[in-house]
From Swiss-Prot:
Pfam families: CxxCxxCC. InterPro entries: Puta_zinc/iron-chelating_dom, UCP006173. The lineage of its organism: Bacteria, Pseudomonadati, Pseudomonadota, Gammaproteobacteria, Pseudomonadales. This is UPF0260 protein Pput_1301. Belongs to the UPF0260 family. Coiled coil: none annotated. It comes from Pseudomonas putida (strain ATCC 700007 / DSM 6899 / JCM 31910 / BCRC 17059 / LMG 24140 / F1). Transmembrane segments: none annotated.
């Protein structure tokens, strides 16, 4: 049994989280907003350093989060009901960690109280991304950074 004074992500199921609690699990790394390529042979997913046109390349925040689906119809919306599909998310992702019953890392803003730690610890790709406006889609393969685990 988990103590009542434990943080919400340790004592609640994903389905029990409020919208605010759910949104706060996002560490602000921006990795889910990077373009990904799928290997046709083995279905592996590879992250590129090519960012969605709405992603601020320094802050790793969406520049129009409330209206993102109007600008990017295939933008991914993470919800508790899709937790079984989170395997493509980085192993550091708060959504993935909590869905797997794991704790948040020490650098996560809900643990340390500092939203900049995700950048200072180089978890995010802040300053290392390119906008999709600047790279032709045929060249995305040249910008692979890691394979989803």
């Amino acid at each position: 049994m988990i103590a009542e004074n434990a943080p919400f992500w340790r004592r609640k199921t994903l389905e029990q989280l409020s919208q605010q609690e759910w949104e706060s699990l996002c560490d602000g790394c921006g990795l889910c907003c990077l373009q990904k390529l799928e290997d046709e042979d083995d279905n592996s997913v590879y992250y590129t350093r090519i960012a969605c046109k709405l992603l601020d390349l320094d802050t790793c925040q969406c520049s129009d989060y409330p209206n993102r689906f109007a600008h990017v119809p295939d933008c991914i919306q993470l919800t508790p009901g899709k937790a079984d599909q989170f395997k493509w998310l980085p192993s550091t992702c708060g959504y993935r960690l909590v869905s797997e019953g794991k704790d948040l890392p020490a650098w996560h803003h809900l643990v340390c109280g500092d939203r900049q730690q995700v950048h200072e610890q180089r978890i995010s790709q802040s300053g290392r991304m390119l906008s999709e406006h600047d790279v032709h889609e045929d060249d995305w393969e040249d910008h692979l950074i890691f394979r989803a685990s």
